[in-house]
Amino acid sequence: MARKKIALIGSGMIGGTLAHMIGLKELGDVVLFDIEEGMPQGKALDIAESSPVDGFDVSLTGANVYEAIEGADVVIVTAGVARKPGMSRDDLLGINLKVMEQVGAGIKKYASSAFVICITNPLDAMVWALQKFSGLPKQKVVGMAGVLDSARFRYFLSKEFKVSVKDVTAFVLGGHGDSMVPLVRYSTVGGISLPDLVKMGWTTQEKIDQIIQRVRNGGAEIVGLLKTGSAFYAPAASAISMAEAYLKDIKRVVPVATYLSGEYGVKDTYVGVPVVLGAGGVERVIEIDLDKKERSAFEQSVNAVKKLCEACIAIAPCLK
């Protein structure tokens, strides 16, 4: 049986990390694409030369033309401008929307059967635009945000409680931005809910609130520390987990930016909610009960995403 083909659009820090992780997991053959000549070829060769040491057998190639992604089973899109200190994800909209138009056309022509994972910011608006530009089925085009935001939430909680990250479950709803909604009520440590852990005296509500704010500021915190770039290890790992769920039909329950057509009372918008991810792409959107406060925060987040989509339409009326 032929190996799966995974195309990576954008060969920056996330793209290179994705390629290496795919090789280590032997998920499939890799095509690194970038408009900058030499960049994808150099990274592909460098990673390929590590394969005898790490003991993996996959093909890694670099390319500057979209023909190279033809027939890809999975396409992961990281192309675009990354944040710099002082910038919000929303500041990238105008530049990265034009990139999504080009990428969407390339996917539409050469990889129309692929499962597409978008990482480019501002995430929710970019994946919404990418689906429209590519014309691919909505359940086959998703955004990577919730897995990353939830991983940050889980990590910070594990540090607070001094327990293994494996025993912490948590997830984040809404857009990938300052209005994201970390759900405390649905988050657990060893099956014990966070509100119960507060009652048990393991932590305080004040500390939980501080963690929530740190989750919302997670990307900016790393941008501020790096100064010349943004996060790439955790975003890449998050996207790989999604690609693996699709390629191996694992039926993972994960939060992703997916198209909503009435779920949660939201229509024609991509926003982060829990889904079942398998060989059919988004196979099911999971609607959880939200209390009044959670619902209000979620609606605020959705409205922030809708404003970004309206800004996209103002730039590219064809998206309407």
From Swiss-Prot:
Gene3D superfamilies: Lactate dehydrogenase/glycoside hydrolase, family 4, C-terminal (3.90.110.10), NAD(P)-binding Rossmann-like Domain (3.40.50.720)
Family matches, as SUPFAM superfamilies: LDH C-terminal domain-like, NAD(P)-binding Rossmann-fold domains
Residues where NAD(+) binds: G10, S11, G12, M13, I14, G15, D34, N96, I119, T120, N121
Xref: PANTHER family: L-2-HYDROXYCARBOXYLATE DEHYDROGENASE (NAD(P)(+)), L-LACTATE DEHYDROGENASE
Entry similarity comment: Belongs to the LDH/MDH superfamily. MDH type 3 family.
NAD listed as a keyword: yes
Catalytically driven reaction(s): (S)-malate + NAD(+) = oxaloacetate + NADH + H(+)
Species assigned in the record: Bartonella quintana (strain Toulouse)
Gene designation per UniProt: mdh
Key words of the record: NAD, Oxidoreductase, Tricarboxylic acid cycle
GO function term, MF aspect, one: L-lactate dehydrogenase activity
UniProt EC number: 1.1.1.37
Active-site annotation: H176
Binding site for substrate: R83, R89, N121, R152
Any single GO BP term: lactate metabolic process
Protein name per Swiss-Prot or TrEMBL: Malate dehydrogenase
UniProt function note: Catalyzes the reversible oxidation of malate to oxaloacetate.
A Pfam family that the UniProt record links to this protein: Ldh_1_C
HAMAP family from the UniProt entry: Malate_dehydrog_3
